């Protein structure tokens, strides 16, 4: 049996051997601020490397080699060339990340290092966060406007506040750049009458003004019956270079989407039947509509060679609407399928915030040092309207034909009305420092304190509740540069998670504090042969405490004494091979479990100690191989593997493991014209991408599909 610390002595010994083999050449890593002139250039089209700056892992603009944490980055062109339609598909190709989204969470939930959902795996857009409500995030919409996606694995509350125990995903959009105006038009068409029209335009308007504009419209008939979907995304930014050391950037991003409204196929006698793959059991007048608008004003000021200031003022809104029949249950006794769970829900959310940081270079005890000090403040207003307690007209469910389900219409015995509104006020102060202890050794530290006040007004009984929460988090990491292109690191960090989405905590949840987590991690990173080979290895141990659990002596009582932990290994590799071959591969292993957790079952407290949390695969792996054929043609193919996962806390229902193959082809037919072909699920594998209704429904992955694109530059 693997010990709680993953046989840490062996891990450390292995890392030390790797370190010694890399050599001990002096590798000075002096901390330098950006030059005094702030310039904007076109984004690099090359892949990300270990010497590239990663913003998700630190506010100090450190490279991956300098960061004492497991980080990775996906280039936007790389994402689009592989046919990844959304952030979740793209980021699931990075080490240890699994997409587990359902319509109830906006289709965006992720699993990382044994922790799942919006409350533990945070998603940022351009470094900013919209606080999730009812476990839902619906921005960004697609991958067209993405410059890159950065991933920081492990606790990150010291950087971004509560809700970041498993990982942080930072989606960075394309930015304005200086130079001649460049335009890029894409037309796409594929299986299920899928269509795309997209535009990317940017460049200089004057010596001081530059811009970036992205538009993308998608629509499809979908691969299930009545599975129509459509979305429109806009991303625009205007950058003003007021002086050599002062810039202002005004940006607005907006998405309007109506996703394929799909809650999966029911299990028949506990088994999946392949003939039901394209069935849709939802109602005729179903609704799933998201409208998100983000406006941001960023000010960057190079005050001196040693001091910079950055401020971001933002206004974010999200309006979401669902109206569906979500549950489909098979009765083994009567051999009948019933439809129930008629839910009508609306979210109205508004967030105003500001983040101010100062970065300065200084001396600390005679040692070169760099620090970031900052604060952020947010006010979030949220209103929930629904038909709770969700009583169906037919409590036993409506019988429907499993092969030819009649759509029917929405019906509920519970009226649709406003349930509550809340105002959440958040303030945090934070700091981060990197000090060069020697030519090879550096220490990175960070602290953060969050204050949160939640005021909830129930609109049906005119009651009011309020809760104040405080989160304290810190980290410390050591990085030893073995050579200029290799480093070994160790770090300890903490995080806090809410017992639910903070802005929508119910009165019962408001009685409890934040859950707390801590992580120990060691790792190794190395680039060889002029960056033709880059590889990383990380091992970690995470413990999360203060989970809500049923009192073993009184099943009607909830206590905050539960505990969950995970141990894991992650490895990644990028290899440039002879003859224009390129290989990218990664693999992850995690052993996640409940250490102390009781669940109430029919009024009885049942221990789930030792069970695996829901939606957590033990193993994941990804591989992608590219080949350049001459100067005009590139082909690529890849595999995605996800291990089996449990669908319920009792670990009685299981989703099987799957391996899916994808492929791509691009041909530069003319100087300014490129034709592309993407094939998803090449071998038409039928698999459960996620689950709903505690595993009674499988949300299937997309069948084999082909998509052709024409890209024109002018």
What are these regions (language model features)?
Residues 128-153:
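Short acidic/polar hinge/loop motifs at secondary-structure boundaries
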Residues 440, 532, 541-543, 560-650, ...:
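Gram-negative outer-membrane beta-barrel transporters
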